[in-house]
């Protein structure tokens, strides 16, 4: 039983690390990053996302919020990682 718990814990850490590692942002000094307000403006004006929470995650900017679905008919909850230097989307997760 103890072995099973250890295995489950190890698997959870591995999955968590893999999911986090998939947002590959460049490792550059924060002095080269876009200013937070400029990044937020880009997210709203260029991508059309509504921001609920904005934060830094590792070497990425990350938001939780809402965006239009692919067909443009409804809003979806999203989690998006951005390159902090260029503002490009690195990874986008849509809650189903």
Language model features: what each stretch is:
Residues 1-22:
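Classic N-terminal secretory signal peptides
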Residues 12-14, 42-45, 54, 71-73:
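Sterically constrained small-residue positions within well-ordered secondary structures
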Residues 24-51:
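Short, non-transmembrane alpha-helical segments in secretory-pathway proteins
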Residues 48, 83-86:
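Alpha-helix termination/capping residues and helix-transition junctions
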Residues 50-80, 95:
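Exposed beta-strand-loop-beta-strand "reactive/processing" segments of non-cytosolic proteins
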Residues 85-96:
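Short, low-complexity, Pro/Ser/Thr/Gly-rich segments in the mature regions of secreted, periplasmic
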């Amino acid at each position: 039983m103890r072995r099973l718990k250890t295995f489950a814990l190890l698997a959870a850490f591995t999955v968590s690390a893999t999911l986090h590692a998939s947002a590959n942002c460049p490792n550059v000094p924060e002095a080269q990053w876009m200013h937070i307000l400029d990044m937020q403006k880009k997210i709203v004006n260029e991508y059309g996302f509504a921001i609920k929470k904005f934060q830094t995650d590792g070497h990425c900017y990350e938001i939780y919020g809402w965006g239009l679905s692919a067909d443009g008919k409804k809003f979806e909850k999203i989690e998006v990682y951005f390159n902090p230097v260029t503002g490009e989307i690195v990874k986008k997760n849509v809650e189903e």
